[in-house]
Amino acid sequence: MANGAQNASGTPAPAASRSGGHVVSARATTIGLMAILLWSFMAGTVRIVSENFGATLGSALIYTVGGILLLMFRRPAPIREFPKKYLIIGGLLFVFYESSISLSLGLASTDASSVEVSLVNYLWPTMMVLLSAGVSHRKHAVVKVLPGAIVATAGVVLTVGGNSGLDWHAAVQHIAANPLPYALAFAGALAWSVYAVFTPAMSHGVDGTSLFFPCVAVALWIIHFASGQGWPAEPPSLVAWLFVLIAAAAIGGGYACWGYGILHGSMERLAIASYATPVLSTGASAVLLGLALSLPFWCGALLVAVGSVLNYLVSARK
């Protein structure tokens, strides 16, 4: 067909069925949304693992186990089937994002700085929404999604920062005194949004998640050994190892679902839904760690919902 596919009755297939150069599958979009639910357990489980194994060793163990699980249950295609452009650019972006987030949290000097760095990292849903709008070829798409993006981003700040007692004056001082973790978190957020929006078109439908994930594990082991940190003084308990497995399954499973979703589902829908990631993550962490959810959290969650609905309405109005 020269200009668009036709269905059995000869009627042209609707343009809305295509996104990012592929035919959108509702099933794939749903699978992509499952990633957001799985990732909600990431922060809490990683925190528990880090308390028992240390930050760098804990991350390396999680991604090693996650990589093994992916290779067992979702083996990657043979290397020769991967487009070289996707393999190089996609692989570098994936590994850089994961490594930069791990490093940025490790370099944060205080608990308050860790919260601030996490907030910078959570700019990726906003970046992803704006990039998705920018490549959609719809007139004034970026301007139209901007109000919803601003509202949702303000909600993320309230959800994550407000629930942790974020002090903006102190945050500015922390950035001035130790800018590297914040710069890494920002660069990582940008890298992940670029990966999600642009690499599906390079992949020709081949998902590299199961191949990229073990590469992250290698990078994290290098970071661990370079940091000079060794094994914990006391052997971690069986429960600690169980949380390594849970974190690995949640993170690895999340990336597997996300990879399938961005390749075959609706990028715009997934981008908008990704605003829920920090909200669900903060909520799940509070449950796992026995923390209370303050009023700013609920106000932020409401703003995220409002901003997401605004962007959904814009995207639905083709």
What are these regions (language model features)?
Residues L57-I68, L103-K139, M267-A286:
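Specific alpha-helical transmembrane segments that line the substrate/conduction pathway
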Residues V49, G58, S104, G134-H137, ...:
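Hydrophobic/aromatic residues within transmembrane alpha-helices
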Residues L38-T45, R75-N121, L158, A247-G265:
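Specific transmembrane alpha-helical segments of multi-pass solute transporters/efflux pumps
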Residues A2-H22, S59-Y63, A240, S274-K318:
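C-terminal-most transmembrane helix of multi-pass membrane proteins
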Residues A43-G44, G67-L71, P125-G134, L166-G230, ...:
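Transmembrane alpha-helical segments that form core, pore/gating elements
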Residues I48-V65, G106-W124, H174-A189, S237-I251, ...:
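Structural signature of hydrophobic alpha-helical transmembrane segments
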Residues T64-V65, L70, I89, F94, ...:
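Hydrophobic transmembrane alpha-helices of multi-pass small-molecule transport proteins
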Residues M1-I62, A149, A154-V157, G165-A201, ...:
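Glycine-/small-residue-enriched transmembrane alpha-helix faces in small-molecule transporters
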